[in-house]
Amino acid sequence: MLQVADQMCGSHGFLEAAHEYMKPEKCTRRIAEYMDLEKTAVGLYWYEPLYIPGLLQTEEYVCELLNRGLPPLSDETVEERIAFRLQRRELLNGADALYAFVIYEAALRAVVGGAEVMKRQLDRLLEVQRLRNVCVQILPVDRAPYCALAGPVVVIETAEHETYAYMTGQGTSVLQSDPSDVSRQRRAFGVVRGQALSVQDSDEFIRQVAKEL
């Protein structure tokens, strides 16, 4: 298409050469800012109500989400984003950062990719739970405070003792640095985490959900 347009416009190859720059970005500028913070965080506190948190997703789970997303993505873009997300998982192996995840029960009950894919995803949660710097807790639907219904939030603490809050929605994302805004999100995470099951009870809850699939 670009080659034809180049010939019609007499651009002498300039339009065709722009092909690489017209590919969809792996992430927006705001997401890129969050990723930079994520890589250097000393503490990351993540609440997720609808999906398994990105750092905990299996390749199958990621693939299913991207392949069925709207608007549809090209195969090349899907492959790039899968590789990008899987690369992020390596952060969990760093001993210098603490990761605390609270996952709403609905995210475990939503069967993404079929029962077998979801079972392996739940096994992945139990696997990362064994890492000494990772904590995964489940928030049952009958214990959810109202703030748990407001959407996902990630609170990030940096080595410079700065704190940020990152929130996402349908095609939108917000990175907050204002102390009052961040404080509000930290308190919301604290309330949600306070209502979540203990780590031991969360493990048992995950196993029970897997048995029911």
Describe each model-derived feature in a short phrase.
Residues 1-110, 177, 191-213:
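Interdomain hinge/linker segments and adjacent boundary elements that couple functional modules
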Residues 115-213:
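C-terminal regulatory/effector modules of DNA-binding transcriptional regulators
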